[in-house]
Structure formats: C-alpha cells, structure tokens
C-alpha cells in the first residue's frame, strides 16, 4: 500500500471530522435561535457526522497498517466495517428525524427568525460542497470505500441543506408545516443513503468480485499475451485499496517450464501496471489437462 494512498485517505477523514465539528457549533446556535425542526434535523445529522467521521478516522488508520503474521492479507476489510458502522449511525439519525418531523407536522411551531436559519444553512451548504468535492477527488485517486461512504453521507447533507433552505423560505411566508414535511423527506432520503451504503459494505465483506469492466480488462490482458493459449478460473475480490486477482493460464504442453514461468511473470507485471498494488496469483496449466467441456466464461 503506497504512502500516497494513506496520506490522502487520512486527510479526507480529518477534513470530514473538522468540518462536521464546525457545522455542529453553527447549527446549535441556529436551532437555539430559530427553533426550526429542519435545522434540528441538520443538527442531529451533524452529531452523527462527527461520530461517523471519528469512527472513519480511527478505522482508516487501522486499515492502513501493513499485513502481519495474523493478518496475511492486510487490514483493508476494516474500511468495509467502517462503512457498515456509518450506515448504522445514519439509519439512527434518519429514524430520529422522521419521528421529529411527524411530531412537528401534528403540532407545528412557528420559527422566531427564519432569516438567521437561511444564512446558517447557506454557510453549511457551501462548506459541505467544498468537503464533498475534496472527498470525490480523493475517491478518484484511491478508490477508498471508507471515504466513498463518507462522501455519500455528506452528499446527502448537500441535498438536506438545499431542502432546509426551501423549507425555511416557505415558513417565512407562513407555511409552518413545510418545515416538518421537509424534515420527513430528509429523513427518508438519509435512510435510503444509509441502506445503500450498508449494502455495499456487506458486499465487500462477502468478497464480491470486481466489476465486470475490470474483470474483462484482466481477461483481455491475459488472452492477448504471446505464449498464452487461453485462461480460466478467474477469481477476484477487493479489500480496502488492494485487489486480489487469481487466474489460470493455459499454455502449450511443449513450452519449457522456465519459459512458462517467464510468460506468467510478464502477464503478472502487465496486470499490475493496469491495477497497481494488486495481489496477483497466476497458475500455469498445460492445454492438454484443461477439459474443453469444463471451460466456462470467466465473467460468470
């Protein structure tokens, strides 16, 4: 695992924690001043943000540790656990927002000064957009599942802040139930994001194969290599930033062992150039021992 990956992922986790802490302080003041249930929803979400981002920071630091005697494949699965924990945090906040929205829908409470809430929400929206942009850049560079989960969370915050702005504007003109209605909508959207995030984390923990596009690239690299007659039994998974790739190469029976080994090494290096940092295992099979009827599509 290269130092650039660790540095970028750690910075993203620290930035998210710092931003969530700043926004929490701002929203506490705004809620105290306006009494807006939508801002209360945002405040609770910021509390969850801090818990989730702190968890993310600690788990990311652990996942960056190199492989050891007890963890031969490294600690990358900790990122999936962080994403799963975040989905639980977010689901809890969504339930709270939903129940609070129902309560205020039944008994709406006028806000004292929606203007303050509008200003605070605009500030929160700008800060969150900046954070999400940075996280998206980090995800493009690292493919970190933990940072991607955090980014999805803060993307829902952008949607939420936009909805809060609209709710505050409507409440300003006397539509007091709009505040509660938007809180309900925000809660439903956050719950959807949490379920999607949890599903992706569970799939990673269950060693889901790499995407079809990446597996097809591996097949294309292998089958186009001189000296390789075919390939089968492609198996892939991902743990943190590391892709694990196993494949059997089919070679002519007459090919000397040393030459077969050299071809396998060349194929491995070609795969690593396309997917740096991967753990690649290649097995060489003589064509005569590969039952033709037993060959299956490697994408099946």
UniProtKB/Swiss-Prot annotation:
Induction summary: Induced by iron and zinc.
Residues annotated for Zn(2+) 4 binding in this entry: 261, 283, 285
Ubl conjugation as UniProt keyword: no
Record-listed Zn(2+) 2 binding positions: 68, 71, 75
Stretches that traverse the bilayer: 17-30, 42-58, 82-103, 118-136, 148-158, 179-198
Domain of life: Bacteria
GO molecular function, one term: ferrous iron transmembrane transporter activity
Gene Ontology biological process terms, A to Z: cadmium ion transmembrane transport; intracellular iron ion homeostasis; intracellular zinc ion homeostasis; iron ion transmembrane transport; zinc ion transmembrane transport
Entry comment, domain topic: The two transmembrane domains of the dimer swing out to yield a Y-shaped structure. In each protomer, the cytoplasmic domain adopts a metallochaperone-like protein fold. Each protomer contains three zinc-binding sites: a tetrahedral active Zn(2+) binding site for zinc transport, which is located toward the center of the transmembrane domain, and two cytoplasmic Zn(2+) binding sites that may serve as zinc sensors and regulate activity.
Subunit record text: Homodimer. The subunits are held together in a parallel orientation through zinc binding at the interface of the cytoplasmic domains.
Function according to Swiss-Prot or TrEMBL: Divalent metal cation transporter which exports Zn(2+), Cd(2+) and possibly Fe(2+). May be involved in zinc and iron detoxification by efflux. In vitro, can also bind, but probably not transport, Hg(2+), Co(2+), Ni(2+), Mn(2+), Ca(2+) and Mg(2+).
Protein name: Cation-efflux pump FieF
Organism whose genome encodes this protein: Escherichia coli (strain K12)
């Amino acid at each position: 695992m290269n130092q650039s990956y660790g540095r970028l992922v750690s910075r993203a986790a620290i930035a998210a924690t710092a931003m969530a802490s700043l926004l929490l302080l701002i929203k506490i003041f705004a809620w105290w001043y306006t009494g807006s249930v939508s801002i209360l929803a945002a405040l609770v979400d910021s509390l969850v943000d801090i818990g989730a981002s702190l968890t993310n920071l600690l788990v990311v630091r652990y996942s960056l540790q190199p492989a050891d005697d007890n963890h031969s494949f490294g600690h990358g699965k900790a990122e999936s656990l962080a994403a799963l924990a975040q989905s639980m945090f977010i689901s809890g906040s969504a339930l709270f927002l939903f129940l609070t929205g129902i309560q205020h829908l039944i008994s709406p409470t006028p806000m004292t000064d929606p203007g303050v809430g509008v200003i605070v929400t605009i500030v929160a929206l700008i800060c969150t957009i900046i954070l999400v942009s940075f996280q998206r850049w980090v995800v493009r560079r690292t493919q970190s599942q933990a940072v991607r989960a955090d980014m999805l969370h803060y993307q829902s915050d952008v949607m939420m802040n936009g909805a809060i702005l609209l709710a505050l504007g409507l409440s300003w003109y006397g539509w007091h139930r709009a505040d509660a209605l938007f809180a309900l909508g925000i809660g439903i959207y956050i719950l959807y994001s949490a379920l999607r995030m949890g599903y992706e984390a569970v799939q990673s923990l269950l060693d889901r194969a790499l995407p079809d596009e990446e597996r097809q690239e591996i097949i294309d690299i292998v089958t186009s290599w001189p000296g390789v007659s075919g390939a089968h039994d492609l198996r892939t998974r991902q743990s943190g930033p590391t892709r694990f790739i196993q494949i059997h190469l089919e070679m002519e029976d007459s090919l000397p062992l040393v030459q077969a080994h050299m071809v396998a090494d060349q194929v491995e290096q070609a795969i690593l150039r396309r997917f740096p940092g991967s753990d690649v295992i290649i097995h060489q099979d003589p064509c005569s021992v590969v039952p033709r009827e037993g060959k299956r599509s490697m994408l099946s």
